[in-house]
Amino acid sequence: MHRLNIFLEHIYEAAQQRGTTFESMLSEARKMGYTGLECDLWRLSDCVNVRNLFESCGLNVASIYSMYDFLRDTPEKSLDGMKRHLETAAYFGAEKVLAIPGFFQPGDDREAGFAKFAEQ
């Protein structure tokens, strides 16, 4: 079965550009053939209402992505975030998760950063 996914952020942006509601844009995306949503974790904080809305439009969560700052966050904070990420994916039935490991900032010691990342 082939699935056609769209980033949830694109739905929000299209709704804003067209001056329409988020809900109507979700419905329009479904009419255009999209079946799945690629979602940023922070957009799914109101799990029950969001899942009900997606389901009412005939859409499902295909994947959930989130940014992690493995270089600056404690391992405990990263693990807590990842646990929430996986729990949310399970709740929505998402088959894929993507952990984005953050970015180096200007002035960061890249070699030390890679070494710290390798330790974790």
Residue map of PLM features:
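Active-site cleft segment of glycoside hydrolase catalytic domains centered on the general acid/base Glu
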Residues: 107-120
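Short linear capping/connector segments at secondary-structure termini
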Residues: 102-105
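N-terminal pre-domain/capping segments
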Residues: 1-94, 112
